[in-house]
């Protein structure tokens, strides 16, 4: 975690979208991550309550991590539903990179207005945007394709909207 206020981030080695607050060694190691080893078609399971206690209240990180999971599946509608929940609860990230699953969902669903709103949040961190654009441009030239091309086109090619 880049800071004590950040959520746990799971990296996709084909497209490293790391926080600008992340440790340099973590950023380097992230490219070796094999996100496809996460079993996305298995049901969620709860840890044993006798050992771990009650589930904590749902904060920003709960929704961010679920949105990241749904992004891996390409389930844009579920991410948008989560976004409306965090919007209603007025939850926001402390690390702007955590907007990415929500941003990706609105871009992929062609919701320009919401994508622009979140892009404005991302643009408040110019070094993050530079890093993301560099990563997406590298990745769109390789295997990952459409999502990277669309994210790059929207955030990187639209000068400051």
What is the predicted function of each stretch?
Residues 1-161:
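C-terminal luminal/periplasmic domains and tails of membrane-associated envelope-modifying transferases
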């Amino acid at each position: 975690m880049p800071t004590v206020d950040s959520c746990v981030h799971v990296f996709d080695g084909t497209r490293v979208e790391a926080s600008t607050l992340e440790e340099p060694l973590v950023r380097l190691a992230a490219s070796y991550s094999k996100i496809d080893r996460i079993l996305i078609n298995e049901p969620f399971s709860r840890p044993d309550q006798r050992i771990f206690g009650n589930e904590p209240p749902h904060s920003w990180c709960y929704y961010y991590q679920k949105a990241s999971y749904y992004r891996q599946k390409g389930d844009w509608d579920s991410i948008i539903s989560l976004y409306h929940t965090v919007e209603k609860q007025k939850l926001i990230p402390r690390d702007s990179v955590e907007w990415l699953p929500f941003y990706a969902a609105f871009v992929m669903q062609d919701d320009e207005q919401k994508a622009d709103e979140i892009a404005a949040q991302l643009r408040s961190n110019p070094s993050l945007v530079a890093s993301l654009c560099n990563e997406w441009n590298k990745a769109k030239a390789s295997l990952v394709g459409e999502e990277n091309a669309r994210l790059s086109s929207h955030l990187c090619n639209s000068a400051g909207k």
